[in-house]
Amino acid sequence: VLELQGDFSLHHQTFSRLGIESVPVKVSSELDRIEGLVIPGGESTTMSLLIDTFKMREPLIEFGESHPVMGTCAGLILMAKCVPDERVKPLGFLDITVDRNAYGRQIESMTENVTYYFKQGTKVDLATTLIRAPKINSLGDSIHILGELDGSPVAVLSKHFLGLSFHPELDKIDIFHQILFDGDSPYYYKQLNQINAA
């Protein structure tokens, strides 16, 4: 779990519930000892600045070439290809355009029923917390939608990258951590990618 700034402790609790070991990542050398990464929620402008301050941009991009990465809320913003805010320099993992804080400021944070499509032909509605949530405005051809709120995508998967507009760790929705990091799960991303490609 990237621990430069933001909401990382609950991600460790999620991994603990799933029986998956997790460790903090605060410097680029610590990327060498992990097999996947969560970029947590927080303040995307601050996180973008700290990534450059600690010279982690290139190591993170290189890590993402061959390892699964999940971003929640601010983490989704940092994973996007395009963010129309010059204060944020995204990593470009997901071929999406993201609008920061599109669902409101922190005082307007909300819990909404989000419709999820984890497997073809099935959908599940779950109460989901959005805090100053970013909105995905455009999608590239490689993007598969795993969740929608009022017809807009809030959970997207592309290869080994998973981006979420919300905070699954707050609502103990563990399936997203399983998708990227639990090879024994029926929802593991390699199986979902095969389904989406079919």
Predicted regions: what they are:
Residues 2-4, 74, 166:
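Cofactor-binding loop segments of dinucleotide-utilizing enzymes, especially the Rossmann-like FAD-
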Residues 24, 71-72, 156:
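General beta-strand structural signal in soluble alpha/beta enzymes
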Residues 39, 71, 164:
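Redox-cofactor binding/interface segments in oxidoreductases and associated redox assembly factors
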Residues 43-118:
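Cysteine-nucleophile active-site neighborhood
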Residues 100-198:
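Amide-donor transfer/coupling interface in amidating biosynthetic enzymes
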